[in-house]
């Protein structure tokens, strides 16, 4: 066996073994999410970042269409509220906060617009820790903004997974 053949064999074997392990454990890239509704109305405040994120995720990651009127939709996603909180985790010797816990909460419900509730009022919650250094206040503010945006995206993904688990015709006879 030539040196180049042996090198090729030694390089391919671990890669092939790794690929087989991943395939065997069920790992797969996140593909298109299947929502059980053809159309959905997003009841969010106009020009809200949350509404824009929801709409973008539904448009790009599902085959469900968003519609402008609740009467046209087979499901209505109602955002009941969202909140951002910031709790102090750690104080330094001078009594200044050096570490915070950022919390993002999202409350929603999903119904058909005609009285049938698919998901009752539910709160999703995400949190991240952030440390603060007095010399890096401005960069930490932008990091805080990015962390809140990241948490919002995470909660939108959780929300879409919950919607995907809904069985709209399960208890109809």
Regions found by a protein language model. Give the residues of each.
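C-terminal motif of bacterial Sec signal peptides marking the signal peptidase cleavage site
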Residues: 21-24
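Bacterial N-terminal signal peptides that target proteins for export
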Residues: 2-14
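Acidic/histidine-rich, surface-exposed loop or edge segments in extracytoplasmic proteins
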Residues: 34-41, 135-141
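Bacterial signal peptide processing site
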Residues: 26-28
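N-terminal segment of the mature soluble domain
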Residues: 36-83
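Surface-exposed short loop/turn segments
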Residues: 78-123, 129-145, 161
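C-terminal/domain-edge helix-coil "capping" segments
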Residues: 138-173
